Amino acid sequence: MAQRLEAEGNKNFKGKSKWDDGSDKDDIGKISVRCEDGGITYIRFDYIKSGQPQYNTFPGNPGRGILQTFDINHKNDEHLESVEGYYDPKSDAIKGLQFKTNMRISELIGYANDGATKFSLAVEGKKIIGFHGAYNTYLNSLGAYVTWIVPTKLKAKGGKGGKEWNDGADHEGITKIYVRGGYEGLQYVKFDYIKDGQQIYGSPHGVRGRGFTELFEINHLDKEYLISVEGYYDEGESGVIQGIQFKTNIRTSELMGDNRGRKFSLAANGKKIIGFHGYAEKNLNSLGAYFTTSPFTKLEVGTTSADLWDDGTFDGIRNVYIHYDGDAVCCVEVDYDNKGKVEKREHGIMIAPFIERGEFVVDYPNEFITSVEVTISKQNDSPVPSLTSETVASLTFKTSKGRTSSTFGSPATKKFVLQSKGCGVVGFLGRSSYYTYALGAHFCPLPPLPDGEKVEAKGGDGGASWDDGRFDCIRKIYIGHSEMGIAFVKFLYDKDNKVVVGDDHGSKTLLGVDEFELEHPDEYLISVEGSYDVVDGSESEVIRMLRFKTNMRTSQLFGHETTSNFTLQKECHKIVGFHGKIGEMLHQIGVHVLPITD
């Protein structure tokens, strides 16, 4: 059943025309707004009902003001979640509106002048499906109808077997995760949730037997939430999940269990996990999840002087240009990415030759701006007497790759940092006139890292399988060989700038161990060349020779001088892990790769 949100703005409807689109629609498809200096002159909502567009009559004058539209792609599961508006009681008019969906935020349509009262139409966990309000010369009030958002359900992944369990999706988030491992794999999993601000204690799924229990806590009070799960399950008779790892918008848990078996993941870009389901009996057999929209975060610093501007949100940022003089930042110019197309926005003034122009290029989609350092200074002589003397003095940007821009402007002692953990900037807002008087940013969770690929191993069928898994990069390689070929391999990996020592595979020989060390972090491995053949004393082929190629050089040859008959690589990818088969000799070798983003 839909919930009615009372109209905001002028609530005295005497002498005004009331309108009500009702609550019998499924979604909003398009919003059309006309505005002029005095306020919103016309507004129209095109709805979706049973998959078909529905056009309603519209309040206001369709011939006055500048027309702006905001399309909502309901076919891509986009829906309207909230409206922010600015009502001026002096002119009895709504002056500006801004619309937020589960995927993006519109520009501010209209104005947000000093003296205007801000209002919001939204209920957490619900979407807007209808509007009502009143108008005269201008739009005087606006209300809405909302209903629950149906969460996205990802089917359970893992092995077959077990009894079905379902924690449901009526939660706001996850607070604690308990995992117990045993001989066959994970014995049980238990989730604690948050609902209406209260802790909900979940039930264990599986059997509490002997083993180790690990706990991963999520600090929802610090706006931390779960965004993905990765795990491994046995494809054999047991069908049991062997290991599991959880990722929030801020950090990643340790791997709980082992990385043996087939890998799976539960993730939905731009969404957070609010519930789990799956199958379990004596052990945990499979796991699925419910997802809902991840929240945008808006942060801003500065004064309330000058007119507000708000670019809304885009997919990412390609370039930022800052214009400044010796006193303050005069203009902010941004190139946004909107589904592969560049959209430019600029706010402020550019008066050459008195103003300098700085540029910061972002390697989108591989890089996001993650923080903005803003310094504020006071002007002794404001160029606009009616405005405050506090202005933005300088701006400095940092990115997800750890890069820091130049400082644009003259830094002041009053400093603020716009930053949201685990998020990137997807839009800017602020207040500008002659100078920039305030600056803010819209943040959304950084997209998940690209999925790794497992390149098939080359060689013979002998030996037992091994798999080191996937890391960030390779730091060092150890190779031992005998008269027949390669007998021993070991790898040092890097994960989150920490060294991870891989397992020994094979046995060292009297010929010793050779090493190949990469110049981390600038050098990375891009291919492995080798050969395999049948040799005396071995029923299946063994790896005879290996040679490694990086983005900077090629290693020496390890093993015996033979003609290579295989290469392990993928174009535009780097090697981040190894797998294979080992017995008395190395029979197979394969690699894990990730797209190169540096």
Curated annotation (Swiss-Prot):
Which keywords annotate this record? Lectin, Repeat
What are the Jacalin-type lectin domain coordinates in residue numbering? Answer: 2-148, 151-293, 295-445, 452-595
Query: Where are the stretches annotated Disordered?
Result: 1-23
InterPro entries listed in its UniProt record: Jacalin-like_lectin_dom, Jacalin-like_lectin_dom_plant, Jacalin-like_lectin_dom_sf
Checking Pfam families in the record gives: Jacalin (PF01419)
Q: Which SMART domains match?
A: Jacalin (SM00915)
Q: GO: which molecular function terms?
A: carbohydrate binding
PROSITE patterns per the record?
JACALIN_LECTIN
The UniProt entry's sequence similarity note says: Belongs to the jacalin lectin family.
Please report the name of this protein according to its UniProt entry: Jacalin-related lectin 17
What organism is listed for this UniProt entry?
Arabidopsis thaliana
Instruction: Provide the gene name from the record.
Output: JAL17
